């Protein structure tokens, strides 16, 4: 449900790439980097403000990588030796503790979202939409994970995918259709 009034939320976004050993063409990556990620994340966090611990500002990292690197991370942290599309490493777990960062000028670090551009490109081709749309979709998914959302069963997955669709609509993107 959309909030009745939207408070401006300050967001610091660190946008990074690590495409060592990746087969991605640099032109596609450059196009992705020109997207207004900062504004999109800010808009999403403003909408999701009720899910955020209190802070004067927020910080997160968005890392674009390839299958090889994300497989290393997946093996190390999830014990699954295969590439995946998106990983989210939340800086805060579970119910957010009382945090004093609202009183400081330091941003509250939410965590890292890691996306395999190779996997996103493959999924986009399979699903018949653009790689850009797939990456935006995966970013929204990762952000929800940073804020404590999870999908251990079909019902929670359906709820989370619905929220992702709404996040894309908020930034003027048509959510992908899954058949």
From Swiss-Prot:
Molecular function GO terms recorded: metalloendopeptidase activity; RNA endonuclease activity; zinc ion binding
Cofactor(s) listed: Zn(2+)
Matches recorded under Pfam families: YbeY
Protein's UniProt keywords contain Cytoplasm: yes
This protein's name: Endoribonuclease YbeY
Residues that hold Zn(2+) according to the record: 141, 145, 151
Organism name: Synechocystis sp. (strain ATCC 27184 / PCC 6803 / Kazusa)
Enzyme class: hydrolase
Cofactor binding remark: Binds 1 zinc ion.
Gene3D superfamilies from the UniProt entry: Metalloproteases ('zincins'), catalytic domain (3.40.390.30)
Annotated Gene Ontology cellular component terms: cytoplasm
Gene behind this protein: ybeY
Enzyme Commission identifier(s): 3.1.-.-
Subcellular location: Cytoplasm
InterPro entries hit by this protein: MetalPrtase_cat_dom_sf_prd, YbeY, YbeY_CS
